[in-house]
Amino acid sequence: VFTDSFRATVIAARMVNVLLGCGMAWFTWKIGELLFRKKETGRLFAVLVCFLPGTCFLFSYINTDGLALFTTAWILYCWCRACKEGWTLKVCIQMGIAMGLCMLSYYNAYGYLLMSAVFFAGCMMKCGEQKWDWQQLLKKGCLMLGIVFLVAGWWFIRSGILYDGDFLGMKTSSIYAEKYAIDELKPSNRVLPVNMGMSVLDMIWWVPGEWQHNWLVTVLVSFVGTFGHLDIFMPYLWSKVYLIVFAVGILGNSWRLR
């Protein structure tokens, strides 16, 4: 607003992601308080999540991954509150806002929207009577859907108007990628498992291009942190330490819940 410096503009844009990272850290902290009895355990949970190398990296530059992580943390926080307090008005309003913002991030974050619907519907079943509480289901469900529409609906309406009904923008994105992208990234030239006749199992063990690992190992180590175009890997020791810590935690909690 007050300068034409390109550097200042870039830093200002990055600050949005920094603030989203702070928001995600706060929600993760609150989730830890709700999930664990001991404060120390909840804080360790927040530290392990927020200081993952991949997490720190994603909140340091301009992208929509930050919004996706922030909103999914908010959604998980609402799930935890719903388990503890029930679907109160405050929880429903927060859930609606969180889901609406999530819709404005990446499509691959939409799984949380689907599971939120399943989780909410499950909560509306009276377990003792094995009956649906239809009144609460419709009342609170419509409230959340209305908030989602207010937060995110305008974007999809705009896209539908601008792109001849392509409200998701996927077809338009492919058209412009074919027109303007470099040759190896044009949709018609991209090498995909589906074009190679691979099965799901083949895809899991496939090592594409110059990658060092197959898809399964890449997913595991990128959970901790992989950079560039998923081709810059951290020292293996760091990835192994993180994965061992998470594995021990999962096994320990599973043992206690038996």
Feature-to-residue mapping (PLM):
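Transmembrane-helix signature of polytopic, membrane-embedded enzymes
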Residues: 4-7, 28-51, 70
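Transmembrane-helix motifs of polytopic, lipid-linked glycan transferases
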Residues: 11-36, 74
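Specific aromatic-rich, kink-prone transmembrane helix
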Residues: 27-30, 67-85, 97-99, 115
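Membrane-interface transmembrane helices that cradle and orient dolichyl/undecaprenyl
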Residues: 33-36, 75-91, 102, 124-127
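Short acidic/glycine- and proline-prone juxtamembrane loop motifs at membrane-interface regions
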Residues: 54-68
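Perimembrane helix-loop-helix junctions
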Residues: 78-84, 112-148
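Membrane-interface alpha helices of multi-pass inner-membrane proteins
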Residues: 91-107, 150
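Hydrophobic, aromatic-rich transmembrane alpha-helices
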Residues: 213-258
